[in-house]
């Protein structure tokens, strides 16, 4: 089975961040999907936190080189596997719901710091949210 990653923020298509991180050619787009989570606006980027009753929409990519892409993503997201308490985001494997009704396990980065007064993005769709804000 393929290694998958789910992006819900500035690593999605339409942003330049994947190219700047140097992973754009090491991913293969698989389509849109959603995870059970809640989405918040932190200003420059969004934050997802697990929520069984919420939906966060994003994009699913196959990792063509997991051994290089995951460490690069860990660094960008501030995830320290040996120091999760000190990590800005933590990486977890969760079910992602695909358009054909199936689910697949994908890596996702959940926010791991206080949300403060960050407003919730009710639609769970960061791209849609940016169009109206």
Task: Locate each region found by the language model.
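Glycine-aromatic micro-motifs
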Residues: 1-133
């Amino acid at each position: 089975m393929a290694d998958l990653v789910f992006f819900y923020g500035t690593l999605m298509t339409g942003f330049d961040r994947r190219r700047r991180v140097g992973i754009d050619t090491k991913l293969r787009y698989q389509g849109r999907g959603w995870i059970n989570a809640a989405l918040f606006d932190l200003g420059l980027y969004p934050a997802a936190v697990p929520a069984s009753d919420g939906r966060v929409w994003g994009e699913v990519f196959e990792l063509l080189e997991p051994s290089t892409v995951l460490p690069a993503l860990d660094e960008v997201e501030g995830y320290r596997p040996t120091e999760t308490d000190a990590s800005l985001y933590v990486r977890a494997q969760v079910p992602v719901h695909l358009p054909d009704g199936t689910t697949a396990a994908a890596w996702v980065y959940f926010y791991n710091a206080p949300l403060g007064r960050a407003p919730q993005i009710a639609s769970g769709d960061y791209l849609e949210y940016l169009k109206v804000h």
